[in-house]
Regions:
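Conserved small-residue-rich beta-alpha loop and adjacent elements
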Residues: 30-95
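Conserved NAD(P)+-binding/catalytic subdomain of aldehyde/semialdehyde dehydrogenases
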Residues: 101-189
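A structural signal for isolated positions on well-ordered beta-strands in alpha/beta enzyme cores
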Residues: 77-79, 162, 191
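Generic structural signal for well-ordered, non-membrane alpha-helical segments
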Residues: 2-16, 41, 56, 63, ...
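Conserved nucleotide-cofactor-binding alpha/beta core module
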Residues: 97-99
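N-terminal Rossmann-like NAD(P)+-binding subdomain of aldehyde/semialdehyde dehydrogenases
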Residues: 1-46
Length: 222
């Protein structure tokens, strides 16, 4: 794995961990003046499954953003399900999983993966909750099993972004934000709104410039 990619994952890990560590709940226990003992006890889930998209793109960020909150919360068993691509796991995704201490990894994806971690198989024990984004089929499967397992309140759909910018906005950054969502899939919806014609023209030029540097330009252009 490229050392720059490793370094980026390491930096992202510590930044995300720092943020979520500030969110950690604390147990509460006190006795009021009537001698009543009142408590609030924080009990983390026993197990969660991270669904990490695969196919033609890789998302080590999905590993970090879903695993780290579970780590901070104290979840004991964190597993990863990832379909990979043509039978291979992406090195960056595997490195992110290693960074998060995840050793239980299954190369499966789609609705069958959701079913496996919900109800269990001969080799996979069921979990308490599924987190992480997927395509339309994965989202449909999550909604279908929602009565039997914990799932996010809003399942993921096609990527969308709406940016409102003005003359003070950086065209390079705006273009990067648009492309960052557009490259996810063919159904992504990316919109830029601005009253400044000059900015719009600069962003268009910047988009074409940046598309030449990414491997998923054909997807982003759609």
């Amino acid at each position: 794995l490229n050392k720059n990619v490793k370094s980026a994952i390491d930096q992202a890990y510590y930044r995300i961990y720092k943020f979520h560590s500030l969110q950690k709940f604390k147990n509460i226990s006190y006795t009021d003046k009537y001698k009543n003992k009142l408590e609030y006890k924080y009990i983390p889930l026993a197990s969660v499954a991270l669904y990490v998209p695969g196919s033609t793109a890789s998302y080590p960020s999905s590993v970090l953003h879903n695993a780290i909150p579970a780590i901070v919360a104290g979840v004991k068993r964190i597993i990863m399900i990832n379909p990979g691509y043509k039978g291979n796991q992406n090195p960056a995704v595997l490195y992110a999983a290693k960074k998060c201490g995840i050793s239980e990894i299954y190369s499966i994806g789609g609705p069958s993966a959701i079913s496996a971690v919900t109800y269990g198989t001969k080799k996979i024990k069921p979990v308490d909750k599924i987190v992480g984004p997927g395509n339309a089929y994965v989202s449909a499967a999550q909604r279908y099993v929602s009565g039997d397992i914990g799932i996010p309140s809003l399942t993921a759909g096609p990527s969308e972004v709406l940016i409102v910018a003005d003359k003070n906005s950086n065209p390079e950054w705006v273009a990067s934000d648009l492309i960052g969502q557009a490259e996810h899939d063919n159904l992504a919806q990316c919109i830029l709104i601005s009253k400044d014609r000059g900015l719009l023209d600069k962003v268009k030029i910047e988009i074409q410039k940046q598309l030449k540097t990414i491997s998923r330009a054909s997807v982003a252009r759609k």
